[in-house]
Regions:
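Terminal membrane/secretory targeting segments in land-plant proteins
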Residues: 1-42, 381-390, 486-487
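Hydrophobic faces of well-ordered beta-strands that scaffold small-molecule active sites
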Residues: 41-45, 68-72, 88-94, 127-131, ...
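Short, acidic/polar
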Residues: 46-62, 106-119, 201-205, 409-413
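Solvent-exposed loop/turn segments at secondary-structure junctions
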Residues: 48-50, 75-79, 96-99, 133-138, ...
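Catalytic domains of carbohydrate-active enzymes, especially glycoside hydrolases
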Residues: 56-78, 89
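Substrate-binding cleft of extracellular glycoside hydrolase catalytic domains
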Residues: 79-180, 186-196, 285
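Substrate-binding and catalytic surfaces of secreted/luminal carbohydrate-active proteins
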Residues: 156-164, 168-173, 181, 194-455, ...
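All-alpha RGS (Regulator of G-protein Signaling) helical domain and cognate RGS-like helical scaffolds
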Residues: 467-479
Length: 487
C-alpha cells in the first residue's frame, strides 16, 4: 500500500537522527547477553488447558519445531525442571497479582527469587524475568492507582536481589500490548506514534530508564492479525502475512518504506520510546502469531494463514532481522503459542493459536529456525474464510459438551444466561415454545443463543466456559425458533 505524495515533515531530519542513533546503539550492542540470541524463534508455552501433553513431551515438541527459546507465564517448577539441560533459553514471569507486594518489600522480592528462580540455575537457561503481563492494558481505576506505579519498583527490587546473589545473566522487563500507544494496535504513520498520556510520564519514562540502565528489552505483544482483521479491507492480507512483494507503505515523516505490517507496528513503538528520550532501548516481541481457526465471524483465522505467517516470520528473522528504522537489529521473538488452549475464554481464536493440537500432532509444519526453504513445505489447504462470512450464525451447546454432559456446569451456565433479563429464557419456561424437550442440553442451547444474539454487539462471546460453540446450521425445530444474526 503506497501512501499518497505528501510534503516532507519539518520533523523528518530529527526523526532520522533519532532512528540512526538507535540503530548505532543496537549495532554496537550485538549480542551482549551471556546466552546470546537464540537461533530459532521462541514459543509461548501457555497452559490454560486441561488436555495438553506433559512438560517433558512439550520440550520435545518445542525442539521438533526448531524453537530456540520458550516463554512461560509463571515460574512453574515442573516445566522449568523439564527445560533443564536443554539448549533452550527461558523466559519466566511474575504474576500481575503480586507486583504490589514485590514493590513494597525487597525481602519479598528476594524471597521470590530464592524460591522460584535460583533453584533452577544454572541447569535451566533462564534469560528473562518478566514482571507482569500486559498490566497497562488494564485501565481500571484500581489497577491504574495501585499496580501501574509499582511495576518499576518491583523490577528494581528483583534486580537488586539478582545482583546481590551474583546472577548477572537474567534480564528483567515487563510485557506491554500495542494499546500502550495513543493510536492502539495500528499507529500509522509509525513516525507519529506516541505513548498514552496516562502512562507516558508516570510509568513508561521510569520503565525505559530502567531498561536502558540494565541493558534490557522493551517486550511488546504485536499481532498483525488483529490489525488486518479490523481494517475492513484497507490493509492487504499479503501485507500482514509478509507476502507483500511490491505492496509498500511509505512513512511520510521519515521516508522509510515498509513491506509488512509487523515492521510498522514495531517502529511505532520505537518512535514512542524516542519521544521519551530513549531511542536506544532494544525491542523484543513477547507475543506474535496468527490463529489457526476461530468462530464463523472471525475472518482469516485458518491453518493456512497461520502457517504462512509463522514460516515467513521465521525466515525473515533468520536472514534479515530488524526493521526499516532499526535495520539489522536482532531481537528476541516469541510466537504464540505452543498449543491450542481449550480453556481460554473469549472468541474462538483465543483457543486456536497453537503450533500443535493438544494430542501433540502439528497443526501445520514449521521450522522456527528459518532454515527450511518455503518451497520445501507441503501444499497448504486452500483458504476458506479470508473474506467475511455473511450468513446467519447461532450459538449452541458445544458438541463435546453435549457428548459428555456435565449437568452442574451446564446448569450454572444456563442460570447465568437466563439471569441477564430481557426475556432471554422465556421460551424455555413451562408452556413456552421451546420448553420441550425438557432437558438441560436443549434448554442450554436456546439460552446460550438467546443471550449471545442480544449481547453480541456489546462484546458477548459464544463461549460459556467452553460449553458453547457457533454453528451455521439452524437449530430451530417445530414451533421453537432460534433467533439468528448475520456474520
Amino acid at each position: 500500500m503506497v501512501a499518497p505524495p505528501m510534503a516532507v515533515s519539518p520533523l523528518r531530519p530529527l526523526l532520522l537522527f533519532l532512528l540512526a542513533a538507535a540503530f548505532a546503539c543496537h549495532a554496537a550492542d550485538g549480542s551482549r547477553s551471556a546466552y546470546g540470541h537464540a537461533r530459532g524463534l521462541g514459543v509461548n508455552y501457555g497452559r490454560v488447558a486441561d488436555d495438553i501433553p506433559s512438560p517433558h513431551r512439550s520440550v520435545q515438541l518445542l525442539r521438533a519445531a526448531g524453537a530456540g527459546s520458550v516463554k512461560i507465564y509463571d515460574a512453574n517448577a515442573p516445566v522449568l525442571r523439564a527445560l533443564s539441560g536443554t539448549r533452550l533459553t527461558v523466559s519466566i514471569m511474575v504474576p500481575n497479582e503480586i507486583i504490589v507486594d514485590l514493590a513494597a518489600s525487597y525481602a519479598a522480592a528476594d524471597k521470590w527469587v530464592a524460591a522460584n528462580l535460583l533453584p533452577h540455575l544454572p541447569g535451566t537457561r533462564i534469560k528473562y524475568l518478566l514482571v507482569g503481563n500486559e498490566v497497562l492494558s488494564d485501565t481500571s481505576a484500581a489497577t491504574a492507582a495501585t499496580v501501574w506505579p509499582r511495576i518499576v519498583p518491583a523490577m528494581e527490587n528483583l534486580h537488586r536481589s539478582l545482583r546481590a546473589r551474583g546472577v548477572s545473566r537474567v534480564k528483567i522487563s515487563t510485557t506491554l500490548a500495542m494499546d500502550a500507544l495513543v493510536t492502539g494496535a495500528f499507529p500509522r504513520p509509525p513516525s507519529a506514534a506516541a505513548f498514552r498520556p496516562d502512562i507516558a510520564e508516570p510509568v513508561l519514562r521510569p520503565l525505559l530508564r530502567f531498561l536502558n540502565g540494565t541493558n534490557s528489552y522493551y517486550f511488546v505483544d504485536a499481532y498483525p492479525y488483529f490489525v488486518w482483521a479490523g481494517s475492513n479491507g484497507t490493509v492487504p492480507l499479503d501485507y500482514a502475512l509478509f507476502n507483500g512483494g511490491a505492496t509498500r507503505y511509505v512513512d511520510p515523516g521519515t521516508g522509510l518504506a515498509y513491506t509488512n505490517l509487523l515492521d510498522e507496528m514495531l517502529d511505532a513503538v520505537g518512535t514512542a520510546m524516542s519521544k521519551l528520550g530513549h531511542p536506544e532501548v532494544r525491542l523484543a516481541i513477547a507475543e506474535t502469531g496468527w490463529p489457526n481457526a476461530g468462530d464463523y465471524d472471525q475472518i482469516g483465522a485458518s491453518a493456512r494463514n497461520a502457517a504462512v505467517y509463522n514460516r515467513n516470520l521465521a525466515a525473515r528473522m533468520a536472514r534479515n532481522p530488524g526493521t526499516p528504522a532499526r535495520p539489522g537489529a536482532r531481537m528476541p521473538v516469541f510466537v504464540f503459542s505452543l498449543y491450542n488452549e481449550d480453556l481460554k475464554p473469549g472468541p474462538g481464536t483465543e483457543r486456536h493459536w497453537g503450533l500443535y493440537y493438544p494430542n501433540g500432532t502439528a497443526v501445520y509444519q514449521v521450522d522456527l529456525a528459518g532454515r527450511r526453504p518455503l518451497s520445501a513445505y507441503p501444499p497448504l489447504p486452500a483458504p476458506g474464510n479470508d473474506t467475511p462470512y455473511k450468513g446467519p450464525i447461532w450459538c449452541v451447546l458445544a458438541a463435546h459438551a453435549a457428548k459428555k454432559l456435565n449437568e452442574t456446569a451446564v446448569g450454572d451456565a444456563l442460570t447465568y444466561a437466563c439471569g441477564q433479563g430481557n426475556d432471554t429464557c422465556d421460551a424455555i419456561q413451562p408452556g413456552g415454545e421451546c420448553f420441550q424437550p425438557n432437558t438441560g442440553a436443549a434448554h442450554a442451547s436456546y439460552a446460550f443463543n438467546s443471550y449471545w444474539q442480544q449481547l453480541r454487539k456489546t462484546g458477548a462471546t459464544c463461549y460459556f466456559n467452553n460449553l458453547a460453540e457457533q454453528t451455521i446450521k439452524d437449530p430451530s425445530y417445530g414451533s421453537c425458533k432460534f433467533q439468528s444474526s448475520l456474520g
